[in-house]
Amino acid sequence: FCNDELYQIRKHRLFKYFGFWSEFHAKTIDIPCAYFIQDLLNNVPESQRFLSFKSDIRVKKYKRYNQELLESNQTHIRDLMYYLGELHNCNTYDKENNYPIPQEIKNIYGAEQIDELNNILSICSTFEEFLQHNQILYDYFEKISS
């Protein structure tokens, strides 16, 4: 997954217009690649790669992002997308644990709004899927901003 193809996506002529997509996917591209490269440089055996990544998720990232959202009173839709990207990342690379959206956060930002956004982003998990389904996402933004 950490190869030239992902970096070519960022150079795609349409990419600059999809800032919301990039907020969600920054985690799923940049962070795992950074850990992967770090493991390669440190000659970590393949069977042990991502162990430090999983450890960081459990100890830091999930709790930190939950806390930041709970403490924020000026959260924008981009922040929610970045947060959902973080959860998506946690659940992709650490299948032994389930990282749910806490009810407390759903209560603050609206369970229906967060669930709907999460469902939309789930069907837009690649750039190609996003291009196919971007109207659903734009309709969602229009709905919540009106």
Q: Model-derived features: where do they sit?
A:
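Pan-zinc metallopeptidase signature
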Residues: 47-146
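Metalloprotease/metallohydrolase-associated module, dominated by Zn2+-dependent proteases
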Residues: 2-79
